[in-house]
Amino acid sequence: MSYYKRQVTVSTDSEFKRKSGDIIDLGNKLYSRGLLNATSGNISSVLNNDPLELAITASGVDKGNMNAEDIIIIDSDGTVTEGNGKPSAETLLHLAVIKNTEAKSVIHTHSIWSTVLSRIYLPEGFLSLKGYEMLKALDGNKTHETNEVIPVFENTQDMKGLSEIVSKYLKEHPETHGFVLSGHGLYTWGKSLKEAKRSVEALEFLLEVKGRELSLSEIKIQG
């Protein structure tokens, strides 16, 4: 991994400090809800569009106990331009989302229900959510009758290859609000960190409802 020092101005430094504080605060909240256990997951937010600069949580940090040193800045290639932390390999997936959607912030969680459902629906390659009022919390959805399709991708250590698959899907399906990796977790995003937070709360709620419905249906059938 190569490093270089970015040009820092008063405005960019101030924005980085503000975004870092917001990311740390959100990390604490999501950790307390059991969505970012054991140093899992990552949170990112765009600092600058041209050239692209992204503030993102460093690899291996406890999201419930972060400080300013745990947030780094990367460029459009994933190269660290500010900070001493190491970028997660999953940084490439954040960049894939940022480059192929209108997103300015990306959140990756490791919840129980997204992990369970990702394994169940991997053979189909997607899961559908329809008929839930919470669907209207997702940007652009006007009705609970929206058929929200969540693609399920097979997990792999080849993050470059996976990021290319995700990029292709997002280009072909711009209405997408999130995706899951099998046995891994959820990725979702928004035009701001606030919107990304709303998206992750809505989708995690919907995935839990979906999982509980499946569990209760199985019990009813057996009974």
Locations of regions flagged by a protein language model:
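Glycine-rich flexible loops
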Residues: 2-223
